[in-house]
Amino acid sequence: MTVTDAPSANPTRRSRTIARVAAVQALFQCEQSGDTAETVISQFIRHRRISSTASFDDGHIPDADLKLFQEIVLGVTRRQDDIDAKLSDVLPEQWPLPRLDPVLRALLRAAVFEIGTDTPDRIIINEYLDVAHGFFSGDEPKMVNGILDTLSRRANDGNV
């Protein structure tokens, strides 16, 4: 990775990465608390510096891309049954969706929601691999890579 490719070198990219991390956290919170996506989004905006602007302020980390954050959280909650079915089709038999760590489940749901959007799948996969490495130190990132790669190939072949 060159300096210009690094997330910190591009404030817009960095704000999108932060939005994805926040979305995974929000989806986890929705599942654990039973709160609606709208309630959790509101809490994140009030308490976790989620805003509609994304710029560096005297070297501080930029805020998350609010639009992307909301799209992911609301999109996943609205399409969760479809997303879960796609995940269940590719998960190893010994790892059904309910058995997965709740953070891993939230991460996969967010990533699957974004696959097939205007953002190239390779970027989505790389972003969520980075997020997975932030949350997990074991084999989970490898699992994320395999699952997302399979779903991306299926989507591009029209088999999803």
Swiss-Prot record:
Name its GO BP terms in alphabetical order: DNA-templated transcription termination; transcription antitermination
The identity of this protein, by name, is Transcription antitermination protein NusB
NCBIfam families recorded for this chain?
nusB (TIGR01951)
Q: Name one GO cellular component term.
A: cytosol
Question: Corresponding gene?
Answer: nusB
Identify the SUPFAM superfamilies for this entry. Answer: NusB-like
Molecular function via GO: RNA binding
Q: What does this protein do?
A: Involved in transcription antitermination. Required for transcription of ribosomal RNA (rRNA) genes. Binds specifically to the boxA antiterminator sequence of the ribosomal RNA (rrn) operons.
The lineage's top-level taxon is: Bacteria
Which InterPro entries did the record assign?
A: NusB-like_sf, NusB_fam, NusB_RsmB_TIM44
List keywords of the entry alphabetically.
RNA-binding, Transcription, Transcription antitermination, Transcription regulation
UniProt entry tagged with the keyword tRNA processing:
no
* Sequence similarity: Belongs to the NusB family.
Q: What is the lineage of its organism?
A: Bacteria, Pseudomonadati, Pseudomonadota, Alphaproteobacteria, Acetobacterales
